[in-house]
Design a protein with these regions (language model features):
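Canonical P-loop GTPase G-domain recognition
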Residues: 156, 165-223
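Basic Arg/Gly/Lys-rich low-complexity intrinsically disordered segments
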Residues: 1-52, 263-265, 273, 280-281, ...
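Conserved, well-folded catalytic cores of nucleic-acid-processing
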Residues: 69, 88, 92, 104, ...
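Conserved C-terminal guanine-recognition region of P-loop GTPase G domains, centered on the G4
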Residues: 118-187
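P-loop NTP-binding site
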Residues: 228-320
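Active-site glycine-centered loops adjacent to acidic/histidine catalytic or metal-binding residues
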Residues: 100, 162, 193
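Conserved glycine(s) of the Walker
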Residues: 58, 199, 290
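Conserved G1/Walker A P-loop phosphate-binding module
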Residues: 19-114, 118, 122
């Protein structure tokens, strides 16, 4: 049946009698049947889970937090997760294979957005569960547009109320849950904070309920199906987006030109491609300061990914 983080609709009024503060929010959720209780499943489960939502609700941060490794580019700029990226979370009782999709866009302003919207639909076509992520502050018009897409194509949908750490009065979440269940028959509604790591185990528990009994698809040590080269390119692009902010259009792309890896280290040469000559000084910065910082931050993350010393060169080039 339909559940609000573990409770049926007729039981939810009982929770409204509790007066909550930030400190006893966890206690409220424990009373609702979530807590830290873990059920040991006899049969191993495995399946695909899509993550959808409008831009900037924390989809990539959520996957990174659950998987425990950085698998999806995160940025304050929307539309930076351009391709389907799988993140694999493996436990003793289940393996969840996450399909991270771009945020559903309300207007097709470019071929890029059209491609991204097609990617959303493709991702929903062959998954066992869907995480629909919205901001715990409440529903927005773009959330409603995503919901229309789910009405047509989704199977088992869990509503994730993210960023609960930013909601001072946690009691406000209860009417939001009731409102949400009126909009769509969600399999469960789970409030979380991906940034702070709150309620993630409970979310994983709800996902596992929707997965079929199956042996794991991937080796336990794997956390993404993307190659190190792909993740390195995404890492460089992420640093560029973070450091350049609103200065750079979305045409920026990264290509790995050379990749020489040994047991002791890796030498990587990458190109940051921009659409216009006038974009080059924006990326390079005064006396090369921005490009050096992009390279420095990316090199540190790539070295951590590979577990070895990394020499990284990044060049800025213009598409001709």
């Amino acid at each position: 049946g339909r559940t609000y983080v573990g409770k049926s609709e007729d039981e939810i009024p009982l929770l409204k009698e509790k007066v909550m503060s930030d400190n006893d929010f966890e206690a409220m959720l424990a009373a609702a049947g979530l807590g830290n209780k873990k059920e040991i499943q006899e049969d191993y489960r495995c399946g695909y889970t899509a993550v959808v939502g409008r831009p900037n609700v924390g989809k990539s941060t959520l996957i990174n937090a659950i998987v425990g490794e950085k698998v999806s580019i995160t940025s304050k700029k929307p539309q930076t997760t351009r391709d389907r990226v799988l993140g694999v979370a493996t436990d003793d009782d289940a393996q969840i294979v996450f399909v991270d999709t771009p945020g559903f866009q309300s207007k097709h302003t470019s071929q890029l957005l059209k491609h991204m919207n097609r990617t959303v639909r493709t991702a929903l076509a062959d998954v066992e569960a869907v995480l629909f992520v919205i901001d715990a502050a409440g529903w927005k018009s773009d959330d409603e547009l995503v919901l229309k897409l789910l009405d047509r194509e989704a199977k088992n949908v869990i509503l994730v109320l993210n960023k609960i750490d930013l909601v001072k009065d946690k009691e406000r979440l209860l009417p939001l849950m009731a409102e949400s269940m009126q909009k769509f028959p969600f399999a469960a509604i789970v409030p979380v904070s991906a940034e702070k790591g709150k309620m993630l185990d409970d979310l994983k528990g709800e996902i596992k309920k929707l997965l079929p009994v199956s042996p794991p698809f991937f080796d336990a040590d794997l956390y993404t199906d993307k190659s190190p080269r792909f993740i390195a390119a995404e890492t460089i692009r992420e640093k560029a987006f973070r450091l350049l902010g609103d200065e750079l259009p979305y045409g920026l792309a990264v290509m790995i030109e050379r990749w020489n890896e040994t047991d002791n280290g890796a030498e990587i040469v990458a190109s940051l491609w921009v659409n216009r000559e006038s974009h080059k000084p924006i990326v390079i910065g005064e006396k090369g300061a921005k490009l050096r910082e992009i390279s420095r931050l990316a090199r540190a993350d790539i070295a951590e990914l590979l577990g070895k010393r990394v020499h990284l060169e990044v060049w800025v080039r213009v598409r001709r």
